[in-house]
Amino acid sequence: MRIGVYGSSFDPLTYIHLWTANSVLQHKHLDKVIMVPANTKRQDKSLHASNEQRWEMLSLAVADNPKLEPSRIELDQTQRDLLYSYKTMEYLHRENPDAELFFIAGADILAELPNWTLGKQLIEAYQFIIVSRDGYDMGKILSGHPLLRAYDDHFSLVYKGFANEVSSSYIREEFAYGGDPRYLIPDVVYNYIQQHNIYQRGVLNHE
């Protein structure tokens, strides 16, 4: 079995997240993509909706697609030192010992991978599917760092097919300042946000 692991804030989940997961699933012939929302305890994230709110939005959005599987592995962690991508991949590997795991990441974070906590171990141990982002050249990034060069065969690229990006921070700001981003997110996510008055604030931090 071939499994992609797609971690993100999903704050909120957008159609871009779903398009990305499904594009990788199709182009790399994966059996499923496990979608992992980040825990609010993570120090490298500035999250706005709670763990449970983001879990509900994700679960509602993928309920009709068995190949997109939400996971609570990070949300249920109580120890901050376990909230690292390498630890998540280790856990999923133990849960799926016969599967080939692929870490899904955007091209914009590729250059930072060696600087992540346990980033070296992550790069050495797993295969990566890098999703194209406008303005980022994967070949140049890989050649620019000795660790990435040494494991360049661990990285493959997926083109999403379009350059436009709709960030979660843009969605949050639309809600906060009276906009109506209903056509940028799934209906179930839009309705959940409205029902629970999420992101209804004056000033928001960007991701």
Give residue spans per PLM region.
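Nucleotidyltransferase catalytic core that binds NTPs
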Residues: 1-207
